[in-house]
Amino acid sequence: MTAGHLTVIDMQRVFADPASPWATPRYADAVAGVRSLLPAFADRVTFTRFLAPATPAGAWRAYYEAWPFALQPPDAELWHLSDEFADPAGQVVDATTFGKWTPELAARVGPEDRLVLAGVSTECCVLSTALAAADAGTEVLVVADACAGADDDSHLKALQIMELYRPLVRVTTVDELLAEAGP
């Protein structure tokens, strides 16, 4: 079994649906990576969901003016986990922010454990979560081939930025991470 706590960021219909303004082109690749990781983490898995706030405040007002389709309640279909994860083995943390390093997630991971991140989108919610957790002193591993971005260039740039935070944040792959656990 792999050490750490796997957090699967925002694997939701709004990012999976090719017709969505927020479609993630390599979503299926991220799904395949996440599915490969799940057995190694057993009950140490948390899924997250990005949700719109009931009433946007501050800079979020301008954000939702640009993306008005997203101002839907938490039970709207676009916010559901995609079909591959509709019945998640782990628990679900909801947040109206890009970063998912909430007190609830921090309590699940624990102060001395490492956080393993997968999901979408690499340059937004994954990056925001990784940096906040690293600032809190948590070791973070980002599984590159279990993540996807808005496009390949943004995905790669985000991974390069996170790699600058070594040793607090380390970019790895599914195979490398699972090999660390041994036979």
State what each model feature region is.
Residues 2-4, 19-51:
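A short alpha/beta connector and helix-capping loop motif
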Residues 1-5, 33, 40, 69-183:
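Active-site-adjacent betaalpha module
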Residues 13, 52, 148:
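Short, glycine/acidic-enriched loop or turn micro-motifs at the edges of active sites
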Residues 54-73:
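Acidic/polar short surface loop at catalytic or gating sites that assists cofactor/ion binding
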Residues 16, 55, 151:
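Conserved protein kinase catalytic core
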